[in-house]
Amino acid sequence: METAAFETDLSLFKYDNLEQLPPSYRDLDADERTERIESALAELGDDVVILGHNYQRQEIVEHADFIGDSYQLSKEAAQSDADYVIFGGVTFMAESADIITDDDQSVILPSMEASCPMAGMAEALQVDAAWAELTAALDDEEIIPITYMNSYADLKAFCAEQGGLVCTSSNAHKAFEYAFEKGDKVLFLPDKHLGENTAHRLGMADETVEWDPWDAEGTDAADAVENDVILWEGYCQVHERFREHHIESIREDYPDANVIVHPECRREVVEAADVAGSTSTICESVAEADPGETWAIGTEIHLTHHLQRWHPDVNVVPLCGDACMDCNAMRQIDPNYLAWVLEELVEGRERNVIEVAPEEKELAQVAMDRMLEI
């Protein structure tokens, strides 16, 4: 494997031109902040819609018009007539909303620092270099790229250009089936665990290999293309934390517990759980549970806390107890930022607007449309 000099060109904060929180907003107390947010929302009325991701803290979710996963929220944005879409999520989510909303709608991400680390693990420079190596190593076979929704718009656009598509954690298996109808091999980005779990679900567990763009001694391209599924070395830091011993401990403490985990978890964790599914699946499973049932949740801790509040008759417990993590990127959407961007809109000023370049936007839409077709 060859490695390129990425260090000077890569940045976790893709939108590092966005503005920071003004000093006057940094020390707002909770009561004043809530009052100011509600006042601004009352003045803006139907001109604004707030989207709250399942992983957001309660102080954001309580002001949200819609709560859900990233793709659900993007669809809600597209169906809204609001001029301003405030996304309580991370950068790639705001990009996805901008891709599918009308051009006259503005998508606002309150904090520039809400950048998903996993999305940043597969940047265009790295993917272009890997693609050149992999395709050069192929003879007559074709490789189809699939990117998880948790990726930047430029990666979605790349996949469209190369005949690939986008997937969610719910339809990744369908994306794989589509890709193997069109080609011979799959490059799955950026989450290796979702890719591996999907390959395992389709009976391809022994046909995968990892591709690490940072490892000069890693898999050679000629060796990589001997496998049907090439998994990009990316992962969610929250979900990778879960281990089998967490499930073993839960089963000791709660013998009748139902263990449900996100498919971004390691394969051995997914196999040891009772159910694996998207955040929507997790929410639906708890909502449909009988009173008194115990559900151990293997995902970001704020969703577990929401489920505890929403379903007090169900015993909802975090899979790894106090060791369960919140998403650091989601944490950057501080409610003080929400107060700031709302009050700026009241004054006629748009702050921290996420705009995907037109050509990139058009191609990314193609990749997302292919997903909808399956």
UniProtKB/Swiss-Prot annotation:
Disulfide bonds: none annotated. GO terms for molecular function: 4 iron, 4 sulfur cluster binding; metal ion binding; quinolinate synthetase A activity. It catalyses: iminosuccinate + dihydroxyacetone phosphate = quinolinate + phosphate + 2 H2O + H(+). It holds the Pfam family NadA. One of its GO terms (cellular component) is cytoplasm. It is an enzyme of class 2 (transferase). It is found in: Cytoplasm. Iminosuccinate binds at residues 53, 70, 148-150, 169, 262-264, 279. It comes from the Archaea. GO terms for biological process: 'de novo' NAD biosynthetic process from L-aspartate. Binds 1 [4Fe-4S] cluster per subunit. InterPro entries: NadA, NadA_sf, Quinolinate_synth_A_type3. Belongs to the quinolinate synthase family. Type 3 subfamily. Catalyzes the condensation of iminoaspartate with dihydroxyacetone phosphate to form quinolinate. This is Quinolinate synthase. It comes from Haloarcula marismortui (strain ATCC 43049 / DSM 3752 / JCM 8966 / VKM B-1809) (Halobacterium marismortui). The gene is nadA.
